[in-house]
Each structure stands twice: as structure tokens, then as C-alpha cells.
Amino acid sequence: MNFWWLKFDDASTESLRNNIFTNNSITKNMRLNADTILNAQSYINPIGDRELNLRGLQIPVIENLGVTEDHYTSLDLSDNEIRVMGGFPRLETLRTLLLSKNRITQINDVKNIAKLETLVLTQNGIATLGALESLKSLVNLTAITLDGNPVQHVPRYRSYMISILPSLRMLDFQRVTQKERDEAEAMEFDVVPVTETDNLSAVDKAELRERLKNATTIQEIEEIEAMLKV
């Protein structure tokens, strides 16, 4: 694994993505619907992964990714308005997920992306260890960064991450040492999991319930129900 690729916001990579995205016909401020996904740019990124570019579209909710037919090894949802990391269909091929520069405060429903190896969550709003509890499902995760999240300042944050992610090799661009593993294994953590709806406003919940009434596919119904914890 080339961990340097995690630093994807450097000038050269940003320029590459912007150049690729210049001719994208997707309209901003839209829901992540099937048309948006199918019309998005895809390409082979610098480390040879087939990547779908959905960055910078002001997307508020992760949804409808089933239309990708599990075709991509890398998914870029950076620089959007996403509040909850969840709503994924089963994506057995996905290995890298980029969610930098969103508004994420909660992680939920990640069992369907259990093959994920790299997760980038820089510059979000995750504030508690409980909000990270669902990451336990990512048993293959080897690299994650939460730089720019308030949770980094929580006592024993690093030890907690190492304890729930035994496959982790790189955390916040720093290699996980054997000493850290031993220390984390010896610790006990009193963490209360945060449910997804704990961070949804009344307006958000009302909007989701309205969308549930108007849903037309089983997949959409299941995704919304998961977000509402019905």
C-alpha cells in the first residue's frame, strides 16, 4: 500500500482531479441520484485504482450507489455536505473511500463496505469516540486519517482507534507501532456508541421521512430506513 496517496489534497493531485473534472456536466446542489452517479467522471488514479469522482457537488447524503454495480475500487466524495457516513449498498470491490472536507459527525452502516482498506476523513466534525464505534466492522482497514476532526483531541483517541481496528497500520499519517498495539490491548474503554439519529436535526429527520414516503425502489427504502434507524 502506497500510503503517500492518502495525502491526496496536495497541489499535484488536486490539479489532476480538477483537470479531469473540468468537463463534467453534473449540476451542483443536487441529490446523489442515479443520473449524477452515471454521468460522473471515472478514471484510473495514480496508484492504478479505478476511481469514481463525486467530489465538490454539495451532496448532502450518500445514497443510490448501487447503480455503480460495485465497479470501482476507489470512491471520491470529498468536499461535499455529507453529515453521516452511511447508506452504502454492498460494495465488495471498494478499497479506498475519500470523504475529506464534509460535515460528517457520525459513522454508521459500514458493514457493506467491509473490504475497505483506506479511509480518509480529514476536516470533518467527528467529536467523540462513540461516533467512531461503527468502524469496528472495517476489519480490513489498514490506513485511516481523521486529521482536522475534534476527536483527535479526546484522551486516548489514538489508542482507541488501534484497539477497534486491529489491522490498522497507519493512523493520521503516522505508522502504528507494536508498542502502541500492546498498550491499546491492555486498555479498557468506556465508550457509548452514538446512533445516527442522535446527530440528525428535526428538520433532517422530517426530510428523510418525506423521502421515505416518496421512495420508489426497495434499495432507496432500505437506505432511508437505515438512516432513520426504523
Swiss-Prot record:
Keywords: Leucine-rich repeat, mRNA processing, mRNA splicing, Nucleus, Repeat, Spliceosome. InterPro entries: Leu-rich_rpt, LRR_dom_sf, RU2A. LRR repeats lie at residues 15-36, 48-69, 71-92, 93-114, 115-136. The keyword Chloroplast does not apply. GO terms for biological process: mRNA splicing, via spliceosome. It comes from the Eukaryota. Associated with the spliceosome. Belongs to the U2 small nuclear ribonucleoprotein A family. Involved in pre-mRNA splicing. This is U2 small nuclear ribonucleoprotein A'.
